[in-house]
Amino acid sequence: MQNTSVSTGVSIKKTGPVQAVPGQPIRYVFSQIKNSSNVALDSFYWRDQLPAQVTLSKIVTGSYNQPLSYKVVYKTNLSGDYRTLADNLSTSKVYVLDARPAVLGLAANERVTEVMFVFGNVKAGFAQVETPYIYAAARSGLANNASVVNVADVGGLFNGQWIQAVSRWLTTVYTKTTVRLPKTGY
């Protein structure tokens, strides 16, 4: 009989644009989402925390390598409770979820602050297959050189302990400046 050591680990990588102008669409790309443990994890999730400087518009779920059903939930700045955006999604399919404020029925001063994919129990080796994306727009009125920091994390429980990983992405907002040239007499 051979006793295998338990190895736990999870990963996520988030990328996006280095620069953006106010009002410009932004696409965040998520990769390397996986349970790299050699054991199953409970309450497995991956989450994106959206900064105040962006407005969520659309989510492309990606697909995953183990047959499960999962849900996508979100929080807003006016509620600490999760609301369900989509439920009973199949990990073998890619879904495009409309998440514009009007579609979600948000108040004028309300915005999505967090989106979370909730999978439950995943086996060792659970991983994304097709890439998930989150689309947002830089809010208008942002100052030149404003920094937008977006944080994604992934995690799961093993024997009551959270196994987690974090990825951050920085986008600098720049505003267009109009330069008036002097008129010449010619």
Regions of interest found by a model, annotated:
Residues 11-17:
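Short, compositionally biased P/S/T/A/G/V-rich stretches that sit at domain boundaries
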Residues 16, 32-34, 136, 154:
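Hydrophobic beta-strand positions in extracellular immunoglobulin-like domains
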Residues 45, 49-114:
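A surface/secretory-pathway sequence property marking extracellular, secreted
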Residues 1, 30, 95-148:
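Low-complexity, intrinsically disordered segments enriched in Ser/Thr together with acidic residues
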Residues 7-9, 23-27, 41-43, 112, ...:
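A general secondary-structure signal for short beta-strands and their flanking turns/coil
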Residues 18-50:
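Short beta-strand elements of extracellular/lumenal beta-sandwich folds
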Residues 1-11, 136-186:
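Extracellular/luminal low-complexity Ser/Thr/Pro-rich, glycosylation-prone repeat/linker regions
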